[in-house]
Amino acid sequence: ARVAAGSGRPMALQSWPCFEPGTWASVGAEADRWRAEAGEPPPILAVDRDEGAVASARANAERAGVVEAIEWRTGAISDLLPPSSGGGPGLLLTNPPWGGRLSAGGDLRNLYATLGRVAREQFAGWRIGVLVAERALARQIRPGLSEALQLEPGGRRAWLLTGPVDR
């Protein structure tokens, strides 16, 4: 959709005493230039097995004005296919369950292994990014993923691990 976060609404920083409207306008013009040069965005596919999660994400996308840029599906990881709009290799970005609250402490190794199998079968040549709370689980998807980012959502340590998807 190529829409900057917060565009189309006033930002709190605009009321700061040190705010410089000229600099703000310059940054906005540069973003518009980049957007024009970037061309069409890659296809975006949002999938979850829970219809409520998909509906909630869709409502958020609607409020952000990007709902039409996303292909929406409900389904299991084992049935995951690339976006129907094609577009060639892209990025498979996933936030699979971490355990604890979502799986009541169940064993997630099979789920992560299934994600790895589907990635190899359906997304070979793509890149993958996986947000995990346990790096060992990510090895079920693909050994050797590299740490791209460490963060603490909700006070829990997590890592975004990335790498190529090989067959």
Where is each model-derived feature located?
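Conserved S-adenosyl-L-methionine
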Residues: A1-D79
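C-terminal catalytic and target-recognition region of SAM-dependent MTase-like enzymes
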Residues: G75-R167
